[in-house]
UniProtKB/Swiss-Prot annotation:
<protein>
    <recommendedName>
        <fullName>UPF0179 protein Ta1159</fullName>
    </recommendedName>
</protein>
<dbReference type="Pfam" id="PF03684">
    <property type="entry name" value="UPF0179"/>
</dbReference>
<dbReference type="InterPro" id="IPR005369">
    <property type="entry name" value="UPF0179"/>
</dbReference>
<comment type="similarity">
    <text>Belongs to the UPF0179 family.</text>
</comment>
């Protein structure tokens, strides 16, 4: 079975093979764009890596330079920080909940507050990683996840 690559659009000024990014989701300003379906072909909160930059360029009112390139992307394994719990086991399906932490200088804040994930996303715990040092004293673990 042949698997077709995922296609999206990304600003021409940053379109390079190997670039990793998190798709933050669709923007309201893009609602009238003729190629928006290609841009929004990705899942909000998922991490991707550009595997190929194609020559096709399209106009864009959002990106600096007003141009976007067509790119092929692959989805990457993602990591989040969760509170330690007996429910957190490899293979378990969990619902992601933001910690809503206000410790803004913490280097882990994005992985604890889950800024880029849809609320209440269901994921499978692929593996349990290292303990995270939480400045607020929570017992946190880094977990690798796959999307359900």
């Amino acid at each position: 079975m042949i698997t077709l690559p995922k296609i999206s659009l990304i600003g021409s000024n940053i379109a390079k093979e190997g670039l990793e990014f998190v798709f933050a989701g669709p923007l309201a300003a893009c609602s009238d764009c003729r190629v928006k379906n290609v841009c929004f072909n990705l899942e909000q909160g998922h991490r991707y890596r550009v595997t190929k930059v194609r020559e096709q360029v399209n106009p864009c009112i959002i990106f600096n330079g007003d141009k976007v390139n067509t790119v092929e992307v692959e989805e990457l394994e993602d990591y989040v920080n969760v509170q330690e719990s007996k429910r957190i086991q490899e293979g378990a399906i969990i619902t992601l909940k933001s910690m809503n932490c206000d410790y803004i200088t913490c280097p882990n804040i994005e992985k604890c507050n889950l800024y880029y994930f849809k609320p209440d996303s269901k994921v499978m715990v692929k593996s349990i990683g290292k303990e995270i040092k939480c400045p607020k004293g929570y017992k946190m673990k880094q977990v690798a996840i796959t999307y359900k």
